[in-house]
């Protein structure tokens, strides 16, 4: 059994957790949303300063909540890519310092790999191979999970990520930031069939459309034109109906691609990860389609859909069990493909 203290500071949450394989011993998340709301989005410099102010307290709280001391911690981990460079540096520097002071193995973890492992925290039976649908503010991808650190990207968005589209539509509807939760809540009061919005498709060079790639920029533009036309006609914009129609279109698009991909590759399990995994419309669509096609669809608990350190610790524990650790010279990267995750590690000596 491996006990890992993990740190996640890739964006606007300062998170520290202690994980014993797939069991969460403690999980501390300090959100910066109230700080960034006044700006309408995350300000990188502000995020970094907030992480600096809260990281030490979060580490102490994680140890206290787990009722553990440093002698009971087997390894230290932190997100190192992708993300905001300044924010990542805060967590990575803290983790490497702790690893040196306490003479513990250190592991850098890919943020998206963490989101894949979020489902492991509640599903003890989940093991590769399976299909992962990663949907967040910065990424939308279909990943063939073959083994720990062994991934193949089968599909992705060609423009806006799903979560990014939610934020942009929320902004044009004047709903505030972050957009995902507020649109989801408002959609409960609206009619998802009120407006026929276009489902973005990605054309293939030889004709036809890509079965797994998605596009959301056209959908976002369609919502903008719809709102502009309603206002031009002097009509009140039915915000709940627009939100519901938009959410349904996104959920239908993601579901169609995930199901097709799983069936084509003979995978009977789809695990969802990322902040948009909390969306009720996506959950409803995927669960219904999974039953129809005799597939298993798994979602993380809501508290582990958004950024957290428990998922980072779970990924680190699995890597450590495979003999992987990271050099203390490891740096941060704003962009790093999930398929390159093994560059973060070297074999245990």
Curated annotation (Swiss-Prot):
Q: A GO molecular-function term, please?
A: N(6)-L-threonylcarbamoyladenine synthase activity
Q: Which cofactor does it need?
A: Fe(2+)
What name is this protein filed under? Answer: tRNA N6-adenosine threonylcarbamoyltransferase
Lineage, top-rank taxon, reads Bacteria
NCBIfam families found in the cross-reference section: gcp_kae1, T6A_TsaD_YgjD
GO BP annotations of the record are: tRNA threonylcarbamoyladenosine modification
Q: Which organism is it from?
A: Nostoc punctiforme (strain ATCC 29133 / PCC 73102)
The UniProt keywords, alphabetically, are:
Acyltransferase, Cytoplasm, Iron, Metal-binding, Transferase, tRNA processing
SUPFAM superfamilies, per database record: Actin-like ATPase domain (SSF53067)
How would you classify this enzyme at the top EC level?
transferase
E.C. number(s) listed in UniProt: 2.3.1.234
Q: Which GO terms describe its cellular component?
A: cytoplasm
InterPro entries noted in UniProt: ATPase_NBD, Gcp-like_dom, KAE1/TsaD, Peptidase_M22_CS, TsaD
This chain's function reads: Required for the formation of a threonylcarbamoyl group on adenosine at position 37 (t(6)A37) in tRNAs that read codons beginning with adenine. Is involved in the transfer of the threonylcarbamoyl moiety of threonylcarbamoyl-AMP (TC-AMP) to the N6 group of A37, together with TsaE and TsaB. TsaD likely plays a direct catalytic role in this reaction.
Lineage start: Bacteria, Bacillati, Cyanobacteriota, Cyanophyceae, Nostocales
Question: For this protein, what does the record note about how its cofactor is bound?
Answer: Binds 1 Fe(2+) ion per subunit.
Localized where? Cytoplasm
